[in-house]
Amino acid sequence: MSKISRQAYAEIFGPTTGDRLRLADTELFIEIEKDFTTYGEEVKFGGGKVIRDGMGQSQRNYKDVMDTVITNAVIVEHWGIVKADIGLKGGKIAGIGKAGNPDIQPDVTMAIGGATEIIAGEGMIVTAGGVDTHIHFICPQQIEEALMSGVTTMIGGGTGPAVGTAATTCTPGPWHIHSMLSAADAFPMNLGFLGKGNVSLPTPLEEQIHAGAIGLKLHEDWGSTPAAIDNCLSVADRLDVQVAIHSDTLNEGGFLEHTLAAFKDRTIHTFHTEGAGGGHAPDIIAAVGQANVLPSSTNPTRPFTVNTLDEHLDMLMVCHHLDPAIAEDVAFAESRIRRETIAAEDILHDIGAISMMSSDSQAMGRVGEVIMRTWQTAHKMKVQRGSLAGDPARNDNFRVKRYIAKYTINPAITHGISHVVGSLEVGKVADIVLWKPAFFGVKPSMILKSGMIAAAQMGDPNASIPTPQPVHYRMMFGAYGGGLKTSMTFVSQSAFDAGIGDMLKLNKPVVAVKNMRHLRKRDMIHNSATPKMEVDSETYEVRADGELLVCEPAKILPLAQRYFLF
């Protein structure tokens, strides 16, 4: 058999087993663990290439071939970092392996035929679409911004630029929930809405779940008291929905211990389990040590930099309807911004104690920067703390798997949607993001929704080829008309059973959430650590299993000015 050099092979078909890639301008390196191809039988599209009639393309009928094949892609997933062809059929992932013509090629697991489209994955990294579970639906323009960053699922609450929405992620009551479910039809994004959980009697909460809310949000601005927490979790247990909480910063209704006691060991998603986002001051971060708590943090403090503290005070005053002329409001804001706990947040992410990353969109967080901030945090921790125990010196595969799980599979598991989204696995919806390695984590090349291209970098539409400037993100056919049906609207099981889609005449597919109430921290993939936490109420020092968590703020970050003109 003829041979070519490893470099030449990578230039033609992309890297293979043992090759390494640098992720953008970070200090993170991945190494291909396995290549599913058969060497010498690779498929590639183009003039003089393999995927031609009677060669790499078979004569098989539509039902026996893929709708789309992404060829020779590097897949970065919580389950592995591999090279493979990805086959899509009916909007779902139908295969990860070797594509081609099974009539003449060996080891083919996915047939290419006359009904098959090809997306070139050579030299590209492919990931699952991101899942952002901390959305304040303040304006619809957030959705396009998030999509262009690689996020394909948004979960949260709100009704627009009302003060309640600006501060809390709640869509309160059946009328607002139905209105937002109807509005969701217009967007190329999977959407799910959280109702208001701050009620001490069950009926107002049950009404919201039956109306279609996929969960309930407890927020201190509505009063996260032990009574409201207990009632909310009781309703959630009965109706199989998730509860998210932003706890009591001022410790008015109780301290952290009282809130944890109100949980009664029941599953809960704790928002802002972090350094400055809100919740019991100063020790909400200690909740990461609880076996029933599924913790997330938001991107305004990700990662800790020399500018983090300075920008937070003004952001906080605006988001929570505070008045800088009122001393008590200023004191409230200042109590939430703590250098020590922000630094600890970096390390808790790195050891897998904080399980998820999210945005807190327009409510201190930036909706288009969840993925970017995740990888900036991973880079900062690599530089400051070295390789993780599971990584050899030559790659950061385990760290990369840990961090990608924070914005893909773990939030999907937490909110009961991992049976359809959150990872690249056979049978799941084909919400897929393609990246050039030099732009990984910051600027995707193409975003697919249920196998249809919904957004991409695209040049001048009047040019003779697709690449002339200005090249920028543009909506593609999957974002228009019937193409919007490639996105889903998530609802509760009770609303699904009642026929909420037909009742509201929704056009997008309606999918029920499920299997959340049994979850434990151990179910958070690569992010299940439950260290014994201590937070000093005077100095704000944070310890995990007795170790003081300290790190310096970053002065320079990757994925930053190098990639943006403005």
Swiss-Prot record:
Cofactor note (record): Binds 2 nickel ions per subunit.
Post-translation changes: Carboxylation allows a single lysine to coordinate two nickel ions.
Xref: Gene3D superfamilies: Metal-dependent hydrolases, Urease, subunit C, domain 1
Sequence positions that bind substrate: H219
One Pfam family per UniProt: Urease_alpha
EC number: 3.5.1.5
SUPFAM superfamilies: Composite domain of metallo-dependent hydrolases, Metallo-dependent hydrolases
Keywords: Cytoplasm, Hydrolase, Metal-binding, Nickel
Chain residues that bind Ni(2+) 1: H134, H136, K217, D360
Catalysis: reaction(s): urea + 2 H2O + H(+) = hydrogencarbonate + 2 NH4(+)
An example Gene Ontology biological process: urea catabolic process
Known cofactor(s): Ni cation
Enzyme class: hydrolase
GO molecular function, one term: urease activity
PANTHER family, per database record: UREASE
Family listed: Belongs to the metallo-dependent hydrolases superfamily. Urease alpha subunit family.
Name of protein: Urease subunit alpha
